[in-house]
Amino acid sequence: IDRYKYIDSIPNHIIVNMLDNFMKYSLVATVPSKFSSVMNTAQLEMGLSVGEPGGQTGIGSCLMANNGVVYKSNEVYNIPEYQSVAFPASLNDNDRNTKTDIMRYIINELDYQAYLNSMESMFLFILPTDEALKNYVDPVDYHKNQPTITEFYYDYSPSLTGSRIKCKRYNATKNADGTLTRGTEITNPWKNGSTESDYVTNRLKDILENSIIVQDKSATTSTGKSVWVTKGGCPVILEGTGANIRITTPYRKELADQNSSNSPYELKVREVEGYYNMGQNPDGNGETFIVDMEPVMSASKSVSTLLKELATKDNR
């Protein structure tokens, strides 16, 4: 309510999460004697109890209908979706440059919502905006003379059926400092039986898994510089805390190593509403960092290539 001002202004996908938790399909399983066993969507006990009318806790009263019962609660119960590190992806506004519709869509499309809603785990979630997903360097083309940049975008057409995530692919030119300049659009990128839908799903799954860090509950990001490994196996360096955190990905580190100007190559958290500590929401499952430069991307060189380069330097 504080964010959207009016109930009618809250997006449907947020309201649905609340209804999924509070609407139960079995009356028999939700009678007062079974309150202690009623689960939420994360399969954790909701904590229902019998209270007093006008009290501070528990279910104060009920209304009988011809097809069920309405329980009137004296307190607000936790909703896993609102405590999850994935929840900031649902908090969109009217500025398309700050939207995270693509990641919200792919989280649901690939059934990662339940995984990210787990309250038994702690996560660090590096969430790229739709703007960041316009700058994806395809790792399949790293070794080619002609690298490519993919621009993912959300198709808002009302009459659209099927996937709403589309993409455009561009040839790119590699600059002296290792950065890429976007060139002409590739007019027919789908060959050998591949399709746009398959490509989008494959690459966005890779992006999603490299955005998720499963955090040891005893660990913290407040201990200065630390190295983490994403669910997709990508090492990431985090420095600083909260909204001031600096994120160094393998792709960014490689650019820094190629550039002698010592320019900062970290991914920075978005200045406005770029950091969410979901652990304070309350009892949430981690921290979310929103970035609008690019998603987490791997380096272009393999371990064996790096070892060969080191050996060459040592022999000079």
Summary of predicted features, one role per range:
Residues 1-316:
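Mature, structured domains of secreted/extracytosolic soluble proteins
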